[in-house]
Amino acid sequence: MSAPRTLYDKIWDDHLVDSQADGTCLLYIDRHLVHEVTSPQAFEGLRIAGRKVRAPEKTLAVVDHNVPTSPDRHLGIKNEESRIQVEALARNAADFGVEYYSESDKRQGIVHIVGPEQGFTLPGMTIVCGDSHTSTHGAFGALAHGIGTSEVEHVLATQTLIQKKAKNMLVRVDGQLPPGVTAKDIILAIIGEIGTAGGTGHVIEFAGEAIRSLSMEGRMTVCNMTIEGGARAGLIAPDETTFAYIEDRPRAPKGEAWDMAVEYWKTLHTDEGAHYDRVVVLDAANLPPIVSWGSSPEDVVSVQGVVPNPDEIPDETKRTSKWRALDYMGLKPGTRITDIAIDRVFIGSCTNGRIEDLRAVAKVVEGRKVAPTVSAMIVPGSGLVKEQAEVEGLDKIFREAGFDWREPGCSMCLAMNDDRLKPGERCASTSNRNFEGRQGFKGRTHLLSPAMAAAAAIAGHFVDIREWK
């Protein structure tokens, strides 16, 4: 009888083509997502070598990072470098026979939202993209992670990837979430607990009652930020919630193929007694709404807390780093989080740009107005999310409240397009990274959930969503 295996072990074993004595392995790749920033050199490498894309039907190209989200984006991209990258992806997709969603296609959006929407992302698959937040797709029980541009070329040419197996890590979140606490708070709490290097060298499996209770969109939020916890990938075992989300998606199996797929997907769970190299356990009942205060995703605190004092950190290097973060953020130790005023609000990104996120925002802001000191924008994660939101009338709620309702794209998650912070502006953001300059030169980013960001937009400062009337 074979030894008990984790979910990660099972997917790895199912895709192992070859292994060497030093642990170097060749893995088969089921799905390859491509965007305009990390693919131009990869396609050019194929062109120079006279190679074809080995499996164009397993490759999907989408523009997201550089595209404008303003209503007039049909007039073209102003930034020359961004325009060149977008034009290159369109040309490369056509030349190599890869399906491509341009900014005029309603299926276009952030690549990690588009894949699941289309049923391109399925349980048990290996999925790669030249983007670190590919971990998002792990919510479906898929082994998904980012790769570099040279690896993008390798996968395009061979449909395989060379790598070494990571260690197994389990993060279990027991119990039920209290009202006002969301999937975003779960993952921020996990990163606060383990640190941004806590998952280094591991693939994390998320489990426990609180995780199982999440919708697929909530699970995607959790897995999306696995990389911020230092891990290569994050996984959640598929279940009936997963199957219900996938069924009838355009690229999902149909008929008898569907039944066979579900039968296989039901085997994708960790065996009893399987070994994890590290286990972390959190109690969902103790989790509050969370806000980041520094320039790392591990710099988090309860919304009812205060900015911590770095002098209380024993390690000198870390202490110096946190003082630098406070200086950059323009904050002082002991400041109550709810006393911090904001200038901007960004709701969107591959972390929180889905329809459930927008519904949560609408509940908070309906009948209210954005504070006069705040500029707030909502960017749907895809054209289909935008379409659904407008069918439900959410866009009217947002506009009446004073939010800017945009076209789909990565937007202000990163300063690669027209949406960015000005120096010194403080932003409540539903995105995934609060690094220095991430949202714009000298911009100050605070990470939090969609409902918390929405409430901050109305109040003009951070508020505890649990007390929102």
Curated annotation (Swiss-Prot):
- What name has this protein been given in UniProt? 3-isopropylmalate dehydratase large subunit
Q: Please give the family membership noted in the entry.
A: Belongs to the aconitase/IPM isomerase family. LeuC type 1 subfamily.
Q: Which reaction does it catalyse?
A: (2R,3S)-3-isopropylmalate = (2S)-2-isopropylmalate
Query: Which gene is the coding source of this polypeptide chain?
Result: leuC
- MF (Gene Ontology): 3-isopropylmalate dehydratase activity; 4 iron, 4 sulfur cluster binding; metal ion binding
The domain of life is Bacteria
Keyword Phosphoprotein attributed: no
The cofactor required is:
[4Fe-4S] cluster
Please give the subunit comment from the record.
Heterodimer of LeuC and LeuD.
Keywords in UniProt for this one?
4Fe-4S, Amino-acid biosynthesis, Branched-chain amino acid biosynthesis, Iron, Iron-sulfur, Leucine biosynthesis, Lyase, Metal-binding
PROSITE patterns assigned: ACONITASE_1, ACONITASE_2
Show the PANTHER family listed in the entry: 3-ISOPROPYLMALATE DEHYDRATASE, HOMOACONITASE, MITOCHONDRIAL-RELATED
Q: How is the cofactor bound?
A: Binds 1 [4Fe-4S] cluster per subunit.
CDD domains the UniProt entry points to = IPMI (cd01583)
Q: Report the Pfam families cross-referenced here.
A: Aconitase
| Binding-site residues, [4Fe-4S] cluster | 350, 410, 413
Name its GO BP terms in alphabetical order.
L-leucine biosynthetic process
What exactly does this protein do? Answer: Catalyzes the isomerization between 2-isopropylmalate and 3-isopropylmalate, via the formation of 2-isopropylmaleate.
- Supply the enzyme class, top level: lyase
EC code(s) of this entry: 4.2.1.33
What the entry lists under HAMAP family is as follows:
LeuC_type1
Q: Which lineage ranks, top first, belong to the organism behind this chain?
A: Bacteria, Pseudomonadati, Pseudomonadota, Alphaproteobacteria, Hyphomicrobiales
The keyword Iron-sulfur belongs to this UniProt entry's keyword annotation: yes
Organism of this sequence? Sinorhizobium medicae (strain WSM419)
What pathway is it annotated to? Amino-acid biosynthesis; L-leucine biosynthesis; L-leucine from 3-methyl-2-oxobutanoate: step 2/4
Q: Where are the transmembrane segments?
A: none
